[in-house]
Amino acid sequence: MFSKILVANRGEIAVRVMRACRELGIKTVGVYSSADKRAFHRVYADECYYIGKADPRDSYLNIDRIIEVAKKSGAEAIHPGYGFLAENAEFAERCEEEGIVFIGPSPEVIRIAGSKVRSRESMQRAGVPVIPGSPKIDTVDEAKEWAEKIGYPVAVKASGGGGGIGIVVVNSQEELEEAFRKSKKLGESYFKDSTVYLEKYLARPRHIEVQILADQHGNVIHLGERECSIQRRHQKLIEEAPSPALNEEMREELGKLAVKGAREIGYTNAGTFEFLYENGNFYFLEINSRLQVEHTITEVVTGIDIVKYQIRIAYGEELRHGQEDVAIRGHAIECRINAEDPVNFYPRSGRILHYRSPGGIGIRVDSGIHMGYRIPEEYDSMISKLIAYGETREEAIARMKRALYEYIIEGVETNIPFHFAVLNDEEFVRGNIHTKFVEERNIAEKVKEYLRIFRPIKARLDEIFMESEFTWEEISAIVTAIDAYEQELERGIEERIWQAIFSLGA
């Protein structure tokens, strides 16, 4: 086994990988930018090195500097986490050239996965259904021809795109020329790839993905699916496993499609095959050639540590599980806790003044933040992941709602009220979700109602907790008031909460 691994990332995912290393007895090397001098991953690592300024191009995307640190520290392998260099074929190649193991798939597989056109072609060869669409399109006239074949509405997509960047929905031929040019421009600007193609636009699909593990000895298994339909602007916010839309037969069918696709391209390590599901049909969407943010919920329902498996596979070990050993038990939900305005989703930065994470049975928190930490504006707004497990979906929802009540993050706005609004929506509870759920269910207006109740109560509680001394009677009264707040808020009985809180000052 490796004796030392460098984690080329920051925040909660850096801590997550380091935890797996610690359990395997592997020393860890961390890296940090000027914005992360007081970040938790810096002190959690066995050794940590400064790699540059806050701008990611000077630090977490600086291949030369990261390789330099790996060689200086004696790290035998690099785990890229997600984001930054995780799906960068050039970085994976550079690691190979320097004699450092890249914990992930091969550079060629990363290139296939990173090209929507190439990955679609690979899945078609494997017999995996894809959304009706075109090969790469070079001219507007070609685009018009294919759009007529496919049928409007169509989506013009940048081949190298991700996170919704480079996707333009077109409802008629009159809109196509501008959309074609816009998508090509976005692809070139963001991904240095101006290749575009067309797909039939699915208006209200479910977004379902399959986690796979593949070793270097030809063994490939799947760990079931995750539903990621609760999104805003193509960014996932709530994920769950398993999907409430699938039965066992459908689950097995989808898993086999993902395994077939992985074998077609020679995939190794952990990966995710994403699909859209509409009207009883699965359509391949894309491959994520890295560890997913939401890998946690698969770990919870299978009991399999995906990060440890990444490390073991990269070292050359065979899978310890066959497909028959994988069982889905219970239900798990993940809420991404972001530092952002919960209504318009604009990111927020600032110092965390008070922090208390939730706990209790069935709750997991993956976080890289702490009280006093300043959330930098240079990076993604996600600051932690809250995971709830239950024997049933209903129990998982109940535990998540309870954990959200307990989660205290002060100093910056977060999207916790957004999660309250979604989890209390009757259609979400019924499992009737799709990628347009947030817009169609008018979640933003429901969030505003939660904020109307939260803000004055929170201000009064802050005032109480700023007092320098408490008697035991006052502490007891505060706990009683908070209990009343949590229990009564959901029933909409606001007046009783106010009475309980204001009685403290009497």
UniProtKB/Swiss-Prot annotation:
Gene3D superfamilies: ATP-grasp fold, B domain. This is Pyruvate carboxylase subunit A. Its EC number is 6.4.1.1. Its cofactor is Mg(2+); Mn(2+); Co(2+). The gene is pycA. SUPFAM superfamilies: Glutathione synthetase ATP-binding domain-like (SSF56059), PreATP-grasp domain (SSF52440), Rudiment single hybrid motif (SSF51246). Pyruvate carboxylase catalyzes a 2-step reaction, involving the ATP-dependent carboxylation of the covalently attached biotin in the first step and the transfer of the carboxyl group to pyruvate in the second. It catalyses: hydrogencarbonate + pyruvate + ATP = oxaloacetate + ADP + phosphate + H(+). It comes from Archaeoglobus fulgidus (strain ATCC 49558 / DSM 4304 / JCM 9628 / NBRC 100126 / VC-16). ATP binds at residues 116, 199, 234. GO terms for biological process: gluconeogenesis. InterPro entries: ACC_Biotin_Carboxylase, Acetyl_CoA_COase_biotin_COase, ATP-grasp, BC-like_N, Biotin_carboxylation_dom, Biotin_COase_C, CbamoylP_synth_lsu-like_ATP-bd, PreATP-grasp_dom_sf. GO terms for molecular function: ATP binding; metal ion binding; pyruvate carboxylase activity. Keywords: ATP-binding, Gluconeogenesis, Ligase, Magnesium, Metal-binding, Multifunctional enzyme, Nucleotide-binding, Pyruvate. Heterooctamer of four A and four B subunits. Residues 120-315 form the ATP-grasp domain. Residues 1-443 form the Biotin carboxylation domain. Pathway: Carbohydrate biosynthesis; gluconeogenesis. The active site is at residue 290. It is an enzyme of class 6 (ligase). It holds the Pfam family Biotin_carb_N.
